[in-house]
Amino acid sequence: MRRNRSNIEFSSRLPKKSFLCPAKVIELEKIKVGAVSYLNTKPLLYGMQNEQFLQTHELVLDYPAHIGEALKQGIVDVGLVPAALLPSFEQSFIVSDYGIAADFDVASVCLFSEVPLEKIETIYLDYQSRSSAALLKILMREFWGIQPALVETKDEGFRTKITGTAAALVIGDRAFEQRRLSTYVYDLAAEWRGFTGLPFVFAVWVSLKPMSPEWIEQFNAANAAGMDYLEEIAEAQKYSAFNLRTYFQHHIAYRLTEERLKGLERFLELLKVY
């Protein structure tokens, strides 16, 4: 990662033991990289699924909440983890200039219901989500001013409960399918932007030990490799529930710019309240 001034300044405002730049170096023979198995990570993983990268790395794919736990347990060395988990690490390092963010509407993280927002009495929370659930709570209490009952879920059955005054937070590829079914769709990234004027960062690449500058440069290059092939990557997925070309190019933001890091900072500040 480039040690630019904005990153260094921002790192000082992250949780006390979270850093953007390494202090020491660790050497690993085969680095395990935990990534999210959603469509939005396909461009990031494009440069990691080649023989050269896989000679020194192993990819582990799962949904966001599991990747965070795998990092904590040492199952993976680097993980694309929900931003909401950053304060839970005793010490953490953001090791890439890339992640999963949205400048406006993200399309794949939404609250779905059959009634308007003010009439929702119960919300079922997607079991695959951490940052999205935290964002929903912030929007409810800080901006929407609603207090429905929140229900944790454990399996895919929760989507069938979107009826009457019961709503559900749905993330990832399943959100595209749910968009076709629900009457009301509240895009959480768009709502966040409307209230704060900032982008929202959903996930960042994190390690619990510092990585070498050489490795960070290589890892950034791997993340960047797919950015010039978004149309080709979209076409290769053969996905019909949503226009992936539009999704990759206009809904998802991959580079962690200064403005996007400001959005992350604001989210972490509000997260302390909850």
Residue ranges and their predicted role:
Residues 2-3, 16-274:
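Domain-level signature for soluble enzymes in the chorismate/prephenate branch of the shikimate pathway
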Residues 10:
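Cationic, low-complexity basic patches in intrinsically disordered or flexible, solvent-exposed regions
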